[in-house]
Amino acid sequence: MSIVCGVPLLECVYCLACARWVWKKCLYTAGHESENWGLATAEEFQPIPHLCRLILAVYEEDLRNPLWAPPGGYGINPDWVILRKNYEETQGRVPPYMIYLDHDNADIVLAVRGLNLAKESDYAVLLDNKLGQTKFDGGYVHNGLLKAAEWLLDAECEVLRELIERNPNYTLTFAGHSLGAGVVTLLAMVAVQNKDKLHDIERKRIRCYATAPARCISLNLAVRYADIINSVVLQDDFLPRTTTALEDVFKSLFCLPCLLCLMCLKDTCTLEEKMLKDPRRLYAPGRLYHIVERKPFRFGRFPPVVRTAVPVDGRFEHIVLSCNVTSDHAIIWIEKESQKAFDLMLEKDRIMEIPAKQRMERLESVAREHTEEYKAALKRAAALDVPQAYSPSAYGTFSEMGKGEGGGENSGRLSEEQVPILSSRRRRESWNELVGRLFHRDDSGQMVLRP
């Protein structure tokens, strides 16, 4: 009898806990996660609207007669498109993509489109992963996205190498949305580890812009590759915040209470310290740009503000209850709001009438600030005892790491036995040793990232 009487009490406690959780989730809207981040400048944010349009262009069948061009067009020259491949040509290994030689911006761009809800092959790539399944460069990555990135590099390395040889001063940029964002994230990391396939291109010439990315790399990799990988998130986008296995999310689409119950239990019972110290947990990659254009308990959209940081803790850890979680994932809205935000930045600079010389000085200052912020993120990761929050080796290949072998005396890569992920000696190393391994002083005495 006492047990029966206790059941309603347990139900009430559970309902109150769920109500509290829902209320907290509602408060996480309007950019709660990034409220303490710094504001992005026009110089660093400039490539993002243009790259969003390049990603949108991949959806077009005929770029000379576009059907879905945004206002002002895609801003590209069809004659500079090197190649395009569709699902039949990629055999479903990766979403359709395009290689574009951007002479206006001295850039070689590989753009990958997002998830196609009508293609089973895209789901196969996205759902091909289990917790702790695949290791890469001292951390963990999404298995399906890594295989797609490896296939893409093998397929196009000859074309990219030729373009890099013919244009030695151009940067190499990987850009993608949603599923494509995860592919280009892993592609950039594989390219850094296999620079010999790309005419030994310098690390500083490789860039990656992942718009609305899935959580695809472990925290140590997300911080260590923040100098080349940038993630763009529009306000309440669900995918960068989805910590539940994606397969479970798709299964729960027809049972929203089941999904909310699962997320409530996980968020309530999992300590943040435990999450940070789990080397298998995946995160949104690199430096984060958060576009915020709505305020809590307000209707309508406000002038967008872009905040940026390389966070360690509080890295989009909480899913948001909002009617915009899916619309904020759309590349069309991301392009529109990023362009609006960039125009506001330019207007502010015009009003301030910043001279050209000061613009150059500010650009150099932004580069220094990013380096300092990158170092601070590494320091924060070391302070929080994040496993492998350092660069174990500047050399090595993906195949060696995939096998978990040292690769011989001259491979330059440490074996799994030599550098265990939970090595207490590595985790207790001093901050000075960490900085010394990742940075060196140039001729002017400035601290710069090692190539």
Q: Model-derived features: where do they sit?
A:
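Non-catalytic, mobile gating and regulatory segments of ester bond hydrolases
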Residues: M1-A175, L179-P451
